[in-house]
Swiss-Prot record:
Signal peptide: none annotated. One of its GO terms (biological process) is aromatic amino acid family catabolic process to alcohol via Ehrlich pathway. It comes from Hanseniaspora uvarum. The lineage of its organism: Eukaryota, Fungi, Dikarya, Ascomycota, Saccharomycotina. This is Pyruvate decarboxylase. Belongs to the TPP enzyme family. The keyword Secreted does not apply.
Length: 564
């Protein structure tokens, strides 16, 4: 085969970089393109329920496998996905957004086509996406198309940000040389400037040598930019106390003897707050300093000796080194740091949160008890997805087992995100290991925004755990403002009927109201195996919330009320 269609070329390239599932919806400008998916062995079309959910799913898939792909149609389809694409941009998630657009001939004639604004401007939606994309490409030249496609895939993967790729309907059936596929897309990072890298490493080593009480703080981009292994090696090499932020959950092994807990500024436990804020050197890896990730910007470091490691720059105190990538710096630091810490004596790390005190089995479930207890159910390698709201804050109280990974949209915070992200993560998990468990915690209110995507799971026989926290509405909103306001109320749905209504025949739907029911269920060996899709409705008091969320809600309300 000397030639292949441009459409097939796209999918062959996507498959080569490890993507096996593509999310999105069909539309008349992408139908010919979608035909080509079935020509590539090992690719599947998930058949998402709407474009927003598809974007969330591509985000969740990418957080597990490094790149997600969504395909939409021009105008109406692509715009429906943009909230999810914006979230991926904000949270550094690599998503390739492929849009089927009208033919070049139609564009040249400025035809008054459906899905347009009726003004002949065919580039308007492309321009909208440019603001939330690392780069974009609108293919107009067949000869240059393969290189542009390769550039888009590489950029999305390396930068861990969304990339927009517009493919005109008339080009996807035209042929390009098949031999181009023989040269794989180079996904390796380009080397740092040697002089700048050495200056950075030596400066950090000097700070390390002088430090008496250093700590390591791992954040979201340690996971996104693939330096989790280096962070672990740095902890092992130095024995410095190590902490994570809410967005960094899963970036450090929480069973590691030097793991100290979750740092969220004033919302941290007193022991964690003291340990981090009394440090005389902070090695901060992959920080995303958003309000919900920092306890409304309440970090109170006593030292100015802060080193920030980022994917494309390093900051040491007030000096920035643009273009110096953290992965290579961490590798050199690990190799050299031993000689600089010969006199360092490891300090104790904070103990984990105490276990729940014994209570009667008939005790109604409550948030504080639930999140402290959850660690007993979790297993190595679990993927835990938590919704914006009580779940995203409560999970910070749960100690993860080794290799567990947390997904939560703490920065963008789009309600309903977790359902789509769980779908994407479940596809990815199945591709990696069919026994790998994906566990979702979502509130009854948030679930109503994206619930239909559960049908996609059933269609493919996927088997996550869906814990629906039924606390009668938008608790996080009620805590911030309007606890009795009508706009924070929802119509209660029959949660336990979802699976059967979406066509499931092999499933479990289980209500849980008491401590005893929770313990019995989560201790059941059969329940611990992901042998079927499960929806567990967890009944909780209406205004019950993790203590950290109550505190955060008060901080958020205060910020919202500020006049200057």
């Amino acid at each position: 085969m000397s030639e292949i269609t441009l459409g097939r070329y796209v999918f062959e390239r996507i498959k080569q970089v490890g993507v096996n599932t593509i999310f999105g919806l069909p539309g008349d400008f992408n139908l010919s393109l979608l035909d080509k998916i079935y020509e590539v062995e090992g690719l599947r079309w998930a058949a998402s329920l709407n474009e927003l959910n598809a974007a969330y799913a591509a985000d969740g898939y990418s957080r597990i496998k490094g790149l997600g792909v969504i395909i939409t149609t021009f105008g109406v389809g692509e715009l429906s996905a943009l909230n999810g694409i914006a979230g991926a941009y904000a949270e550094h998630v690599g998503v390739l957004h492929i849009v089927g657009v009208p033919s070049l001939a139609s564009q040249a004639k400025q035809l008054l086509l459906h899905h347009t604004l009726g003004n002949g401007d065919f580039d308007v939606f492309h321009r909208m996406s440019a603001n939330i994309s690392e780069t974009t490409a609108m293919i107009t030249d067949l000869a240059a198309a393969p290189a542009e496609i390769d550039r888009c895939i590489r950029t999305a993967y390396i930068a861990q940000r969304p990339v927009y790729l517009g493919l005109p309907a008339n080009l996807v059936d035209l042929n390009v040389p098949a031999k181009l596929l023989e040269t794989k897309i180079d996904l390796a990072l380009k080397a740092n400037d040697a002089e700048a890298e050495n200056e950075v490493v030596e400066t950090i080593l000097a700070l390390v040598a002088d430090a008496k009480n250093p700590v390591i703080l791992s954040d979201a981009c340690a996971s996104r930019h693939n330096v989790k292994a280096e962070v672990k090696q740095l902890i092992d090499a130095t024995q410095f106390p190590a902490f994570v932020t809410p967005l960094g959950k899963g970036s450090i092994d929480e069973k590691h003897p030097r793991f100290g807990g979750v740092y969220v500024g004033t919302l941290s436990s007193p022991e964690v707050k003291q340990s981090v804020e009394s440090a005389d050197l902070i090695l901060s890896v992959g920080a995303l300093l958003s309000d919900f990730n920092t306890g409304s910007f309440s970090y109170s470091y006593q030292t100015k000796n802060i080193v920030e490691f980022h994917s494309d720059y390093i900051k040491i105190k007030n000096a920035s080194f643009p273009g110096v990538q953290m992965k290579f710096v961490l590798e050199k630091l690990i190799a050299k740091v031993g000689a600089k810490i010969a006199n360092y004596s490891p300090v104790p790390v904070p103990a984990g949160l105490p276990k729940n005190a014994p209570v009667a089995d008939s005790t109604p479930l409550a948030q504080e008890w639930l999140w402290n207890e959850l660690g007993e159910f979790l297993e190595e390698g679990d993927i835990v997805v938590t919704e914006t709201g009580t779940s995203a804050f409560g999970i910070n109280q749960t100690r993860f087992p080794t290799d567990a990974y947390g997904i939560s949209q703490v920065l963008w915070g789009s309600i309903g995100y977790s359902v789509g992200a769980m779908v994407g993560a479940t596809f990815a998990a199945e591709e990696l290991d069919k026994a790998k468990r994906v566990i979702l915690f979502v509130g009854d209110g948030s679930l109503q925004l994206t619930v239909q995507e559960i049908a996609c799971l059933i269609r493919w026989g996927l088997k996550p755990y869906i814990f629906v926290l039924n606390n009668n509405g938008y608790t996080i909103e009620k805590l911030i403002h309007g606890p009795t306001a009508q706009y924070n109320m929802i119509q209660n749905w029959k949660q336990l009927r979802y699976l059967t209504n979406f066509g499931a025949t092999d499933y479990e739907a289980i209500p849980v109201k008491t401590v005893g029911e929770w313990k019995k269920l989560t201790a059941d060996p059969a329940f611990k195996k992901n042998s079927t899709i499960r929806l567990i409705e967890v009944f909780l008091p209406e205004m019950d919330a993790p203590s950290s969320l109550v505190a955060q809600a008060n901080l958020t309300a205060a910020i919202n009320a500020k006049q200057d």
